[in-house]
Regions:
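Transmembrane helix segments
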Residues: 47, 77-78, 82-134
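Alpha-helical membrane-protein architecture signal
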Residues: 12-24, 53, 57, 61, ...
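Hydrophobic alpha-helical transmembrane segments of multi-pass membrane transport proteins
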Residues: 1-37
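Membrane-spanning helices that line or support transport/gating and their immediate boundary helices
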Residues: 2-3, 72-79, 83, 114-117, ...
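Junction motif at the cytosolic side of a transmembrane helix
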Residues: 135-138, 150-178
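Juxtamembrane loop-helix boundary motifs flanking transmembrane segments in multi-pass membrane proteins
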Residues: 4-15, 48, 52, 89, ...
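Alpha-helical transmembrane segments and their short interhelical loops
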Residues: 26-84, 144-153, 157-160
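Helix-terminus/helix-capping segments at the ends of transmembrane helices and short amphipathic helices
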Residues: 8-9, 81, 102, 170
């Protein structure tokens, strides 16, 4: 469609443009979901225990860091489209597998043995499992700080990989479209 070409020639970084779009998409989803959350709370407030203000703040910070890490991870695969063409279905499959490994479909605490060790060694636990543990107050401040540092380290690594893949791919890019 030429959308990438249009974004690429703008005076802003293409990464920044896509980051702002990602944040806007998440904000829209949150705004859309908020009335449902409010309804859920008021219809069952006796069953729901809200976290302390400190845990809520730590949870929000953890979510923001996890979102940034996931953004850079996804950018790597989007940058590979320079080399291999449009692979939206592959990217969706990768997102599904990532969500599964991250614990979005079941708590990683249900796992045991080698599988749990593998899932816990991967960075994807920081997308769902760790934020939920923070929300529930199951992590100490020290563990949360270590998690944040680990998320930042993974984010930097994913960003560097993305920049390398993007730099090699943009050399092959031939803008077409509008």
């Amino acid at each position: 469609t030429g959308q990438f070409s249009n974004d690429y020639i703008k005076p802003f970084s293409i990464t920044f443009i896509h980051f702002v779009a990602c944040v806007a998409d998440i904000a829209l989803g949150l705004i859309t979901f908020l009335p449902f959350l409010i309804f859920m709370y008021f219809s069952s407030f006796k069953l729901i225990t809200l976290p302390s203000a400190q845990n809520a703040l730590l949870f929000i910070i953890t979510l923001i860091l996890a979102m940034v890490m996931n953004f850079f991870f996804n950018l790597i695969f989007h940058a590979f489209t320079f080399h291999h063409g449009d692979r939206r279905s592959l990217i969706e499959l990768i997102n599904f597998v990532t969500s599964f490994i991250a614990g979005s479909m079941f708590p990683l605490a249900f796992l045991s043995g080698t599988i749990k060790n593998i899932f816990m060694a991967l960075p994807f636990k920081y997308l769902f499992y760790v934020p939920i543990e923070v929300f529930l107050g199951k992590m100490t401040t020290h563990q949360i700080t270590l998690s944040w540092l680990t998320i930042i380290a993974w984010s930097v690594m994913f960003f560097v990989i993305y920049k390398i893949v993007f730099a090699t791919g943009i050399k092959k890019y031939e803008g077409t479209g509008r």
